[in-house]
């Protein structure tokens, strides 16, 4: 019998019950599925066990229990627009589940479920109802036997709500649900009735009996190993146990909502607080797993969640950032919303979560301030049932960056409809403009219309560059100066060339394009030996997903449409590109293995001279970590692992552990997998044949490029050797400069620094003497000591240090100083006076006199001006002091 009904208590009770009944406990898998680009986020408890359901041979684990983090935003399962408006929808939720992989089936699954809800949770049986699939008489009979329910409490459902499948083909089976009756005070009817959408009867547990396999023809056959997959929403069962029929009234959400109301100072607009509470939790978990707000894929989902919450913060008329102030409730042990005990990643990433929530919300406030008044103006002309023009919605999105889903939220609240056709017509026009713009950009002002016309006449270029550095190819089309078709290109002409076959890799996946030569070997059916008709290939682009455009400069002779050319890439450059690309894969692998398994690639650039790798991580790498990465890389290079590529379907690649970037688009049927030791990635780039060809590896920089995103730059092969030589050269130059042997350079530099510091101290003391000699005037104004003086050619940092050293709590100091024809005023105010006046206040007063602006804080501030005419600034300050302190 349960003694406590907090969310954390219920989670522990569920897990303990099934462990006691022979199930192996599995921690929650991540929301971000790194090896499955077909799924945005984990959206059900069974996701981490996918392969166990489909593998007949894997019998290492027969049963499991978990409490799984889930997110339903985007894709098939998208609850975002309902969040805050209903009692039970969330973006993030936890799914309690028990699973059997051929161990037990219907009867045992039903027994366990019934024992848990009636004995462990002690729910009133009178309030429970059961649904089964209408054809599943077996489940009906078992429920009747185990629960002793009458027929009217076991409801047969004919719709697919009670038949579950993993997809259009594959494992599937009937399911059975347990419903809880909140009583007549809540509206709603029994499952299967017209009133079933009400809140009275709430599904609390779904038991899936996976016993069939569906073929592509839709036929069902019995699985050789029958499985059980169950799911109980933790928030839903918490609502039942806490005697509320609204998930937002459970202890966890009450704590989050209370903090939202407290920090915002606004207790009205309940929907806003519910949305904010839900979205803070979702965003925190996503950031903890390495996501950062962006414009593509999963990163955009995170941005979308934060921005949607920011809009509701704006509705509360709260002008500061709010979300980052609510998040700490989730990691506060004394809070009812404490989740960091079961999910320690929240505490580990707390600084990053706070930083990203604050920054992203602040940035979006500007968009809200600009766009919302325009939307509000348009809505004043509309009434309930009217339609908001798609042109307006698109303009808000395109011009102001105002998310469409937020616009839809706003108009939905007012009963105004969405002009879907008008909006998507605008989007299609924009896509067309964008596609042409991309063509123009990708081929240096290339006329996109010309290439669209060419595209209609030719098939995709056949790329053979993985295995060939040189091939013979036919020139099919040429565009001169990016604006006209030509049949001949002569010396000096810049021409974009389409050929039927090419070894030139076009820029993709972060790897730069190949360069090389085209030499005419046959013209008009005649072989040309020692041809002088040559063009340099300076760049290669892949447009229309398959048309390779070679940007060339004719160096000698001419090129004519129909010519057969020897197309040869710069092999030395290609080998450098291959080395850097393979090293990039290994770097990604090492970062995840040695630094943090949550690290995700955020971008890369593979050049011939260096590589650049951007990744999610919330702190700078230490010197020790960088050394570890370099050592592991050198180990992998010395081990000379073969680099293997294979083509397979996407699902097979994922099942074998290949990593895919969610921002990339992959063919559902065929993908290219690059295997380097234990590193497996989907990749279309070029690579070395053995890791030994990388030669050597050196990280040359590690830095932050955005909140939560780090960047590593590195060199390999000859470029790494050149880097070492350059560093060695600098070291010898430094040794010569400080007159020391190389091995003693650090000792000598340390000695020089100490001597320099001693001299600096003497210099500061001398400057202080100069200030004293140039004249420091002391006046008493009431109880205040006012020190002021006029200086000449004293460094400004010396003046600031002088003030900070001499300033006492009841003193105000003001010095003017002429430096490089500018007059600079520096003001200091003692701590005890800050309640009445601050240094920055005096700078504003001076600014009004000398027509300039300055800045500072309560204790120290300064202002610079070219206005050097004699103005009695001192007298203005004295008058102000008399006024402030009533002297």
UniProtKB/Swiss-Prot annotation:
Q: According to the record, how does the cofactor bind?
A: Binds 1 zinc ion per subunit.
Which molecular-function annotation in GO is an example for this chain? alanine-tRNA ligase activity
Name the catalysed reactions.
tRNA(Ala) + L-alanine + ATP = L-alanyl-tRNA(Ala) + AMP + diphosphate
Q: Please give a single GO biological process term from the UniProt record.
A: alanyl-tRNA aminoacylation
The UniProt entry lists the main location of this chain as cytoplasm
Swiss-Prot/TrEMBL keywords: Aminoacyl-tRNA synthetase, ATP-binding, Cytoplasm, Ligase, Metal-binding, Nucleotide-binding, Protein biosynthesis, RNA-binding, tRNA-binding, Zinc
- Coiled-coil positions are none
| Cofactor section | Zn(2+)
Compartments reported by the entry = Cytoplasm
The entry's cellular-component GO terms read: cytosol
Q: What is its EC number?
A: 6.1.1.7
Cross-referenced Pfam families, in alphabetical order? Answer: tRNA-synt_2c, tRNA_SAD
Question: What residues does Zn(2+) bind to?
Answer: 581, 585, 683, 687
- Entry comment, domain topic: Consists of three domains; the N-terminal catalytic domain, the editing domain and the C-terminal C-Ala domain. The editing domain removes incorrectly charged amino acids, while the C-Ala domain, along with tRNA(Ala), serves as a bridge to cooperatively bring together the editing and aminoacylation centers thus stimulating deacylation of misacylated tRNAs.
Q: Which PANTHER family match?
A: ALANINE--TRNA LIGASE, CYTOPLASMIC (PTHR11777:SF9), ALANYL-TRNA SYNTHETASE (PTHR11777)
Annotated function? Catalyzes the attachment of alanine to tRNA(Ala) in a two-step reaction: alanine is first activated by ATP to form Ala-AMP and then transferred to the acceptor end of tRNA(Ala). Also edits incorrectly charged Ser-tRNA(Ala) and Gly-tRNA(Ala) via its editing domain.
Task: Tell me which family the UniProt entry assigns to this protein.
Answer: Belongs to the class-II aminoacyl-tRNA synthetase family.
This one is known as Alanine--tRNA ligase
Species classification: Bacteria, Pseudomonadati, Pseudomonadota, Alphaproteobacteria, Rickettsiales
């Amino acid at each position: 019998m349960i003694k406590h009904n907090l969310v954390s208590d219920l989670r522990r009770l569920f897990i303990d019950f099934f462990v006691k009944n022979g199930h192996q406990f599995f921690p929650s898998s991540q929301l971000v599925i790194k090896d499955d680009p077909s799924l945005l986020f984990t959206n059900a408890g069974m996701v981490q066990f996918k392969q166990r359901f489909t593998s007949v041979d894997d019998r290492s684990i027969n049963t499991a229990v978990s409490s799984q983090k889930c997110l339903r935003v985007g894709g098939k399962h998208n609850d975002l627009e309902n969040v805050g408006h209903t009692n039970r929808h969330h973006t993030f939720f936890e799914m309690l589940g028990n699973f059997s992989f051929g161990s037990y089936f219907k009867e045992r699954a039903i027994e366990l479920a019934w024992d848990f809800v009636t004995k462990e949770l002690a729910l009133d049986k009178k309030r429970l109802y059961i649904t089964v699939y209408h054809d599943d008489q077996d489940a009906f009979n078992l429920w009747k036997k185990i629960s002793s329910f009458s027929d009217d409490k076991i409801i047969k459902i004919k719709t697919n709500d009670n038949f579950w499948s993993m997809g259009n083909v594959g494992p599937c089976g009937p399911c059975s649900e347990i419903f809880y009756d909140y009583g007549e005070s809540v509206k709603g009817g029994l499952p299967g009735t017209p009133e079933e959408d009400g809140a009275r009867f709430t599904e609390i547990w779904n038991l899936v009996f996976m016993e069939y396999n569906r073929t592509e023809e839709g036929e069902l056959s019995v699985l050789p190993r029958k499985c059980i997959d169950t799911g109980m929403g933790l928030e839903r069962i918490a609502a039942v146990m806490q005697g509320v029929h609204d998930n937002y009234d459970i202890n966890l959400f009450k704590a989050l909502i209370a903090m939202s109301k407290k920090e915002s100072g606004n207790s009205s607009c309940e929907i806003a607080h519910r949305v904010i509470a839900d979205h803070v939790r979702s965003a925190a978990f996503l950031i903890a797993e390495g996501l950062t707000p962006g414009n593509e894929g999963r990163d955009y989902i995170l941005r979308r969640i934060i921005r949607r919450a920011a809009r509701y913060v704006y509705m509360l008329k709260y002008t500061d950032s709010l979300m980052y102030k609510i998040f700490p409730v989730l990691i506060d042990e004394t809070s009812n919303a404490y989740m960091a005990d079961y999910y320690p990643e929240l505490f580990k990433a707390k600084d990053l979560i706070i930083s990203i929530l604050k920054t992203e919300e602040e940035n979006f406030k500007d968009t809200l301030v600009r766009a919302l008044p325009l939307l509000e103006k348009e809505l004043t002309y509309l009434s309930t049932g009217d339609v908001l023009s798609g042109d307006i919605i698109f303009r808000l999105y395109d011009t102001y960056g105002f998310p469409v889903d937020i616009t839809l939220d706003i108009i939905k609240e007012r009963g105004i409809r969405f002009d879907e056709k008008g909006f998507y017509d605008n989007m299609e026009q924009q896509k067309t403009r964008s596609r042409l713009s991309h063509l123009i950009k990708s081929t240096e002002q290339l006329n996109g219309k010309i290439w669209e016309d060419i595209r209609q006449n030719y098939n995709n270029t056949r790329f053979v560059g993985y295995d060939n550095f040189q091939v013979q190819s036919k020139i099919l089309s040429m565009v001169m100066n990016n604006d006209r078709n030509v049949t001949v290109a002569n010396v000096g002409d810049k021409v974009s060339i389409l050929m039927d076959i090419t070894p030139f890799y076009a820029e993709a996946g972060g790897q730069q394009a190949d360069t090389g030569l085209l030499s005419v070997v046959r013209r008009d059916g005649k072989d040309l030996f020692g041809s002088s008709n040559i063009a340099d290939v300076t760049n290669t682009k892949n447009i229309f997903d398959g048309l390779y455009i070679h940007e060339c400069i004719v160096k000698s002779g001419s090129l004519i449409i129909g010519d057969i050319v020897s197309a040869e890439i710069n092999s030395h450059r290609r080998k450098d590109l291959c080395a850097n690309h393979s090293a990039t894969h290994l770097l990604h692998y090492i970062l995840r293995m040695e630094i943090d398994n949550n690290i995700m690639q955020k971008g890369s650039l593979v050049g011939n001279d260096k590589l650049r790798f951007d990744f999610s991580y919330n702190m700078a790498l230490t010197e020790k970590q960088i050394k570890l990465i370099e050592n592991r890389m050198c180990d992998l290079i010395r081990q000379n692992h073969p680099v293997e590529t294979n083509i397979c379907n996407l699902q097979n690649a994922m099942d074998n552990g290949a990593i895919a970037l969610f921002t990339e688009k992959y063919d559902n049927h065929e993908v290219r997998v690059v295997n380097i030791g234990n590193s497996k990635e989907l990749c279309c780039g070029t690579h070395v044949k053995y890791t030994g060809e990388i030669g050597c590896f050196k990280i040359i920089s590690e830095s932050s490029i955005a909140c939560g995103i780090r960047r590593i730059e590195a060199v390999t092969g000859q470029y790494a050797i050149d880097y070492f030589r350059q560093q060695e050269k600098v070291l010898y130059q430094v040794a010569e400069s400080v007159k020391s042997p190389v091995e003693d350079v650090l000792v000598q530099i340390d000695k020089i620094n100490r001597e320099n510091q001693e001299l600096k101290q003497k210099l500061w003391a001398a400057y202080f003497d100069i200030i004293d000699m140039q004249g420091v005037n002391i006046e008493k104004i009431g109880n205040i000591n006012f020190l002021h003086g006029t200086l000449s050619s004293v460094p400004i940092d010396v003046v600031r240090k002088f003030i900070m050293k001499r300033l006492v709590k009841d003193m105000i100091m003001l010095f003017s100083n002429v430096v490089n024809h500018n007059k600079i005023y520096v003001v200091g105010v003692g701590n005890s006076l800050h309640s009445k006046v601050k240094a920055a206040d005096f700078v504003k007063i001076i600014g009004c006199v000398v027509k300039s602006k300055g800045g500072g804080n309560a204790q120290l501030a300064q202002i610079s001006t070219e206005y050097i005419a004699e103005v009695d600034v001192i007298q203005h300050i004295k008058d102000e002091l008399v006024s402030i302190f009533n002297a």
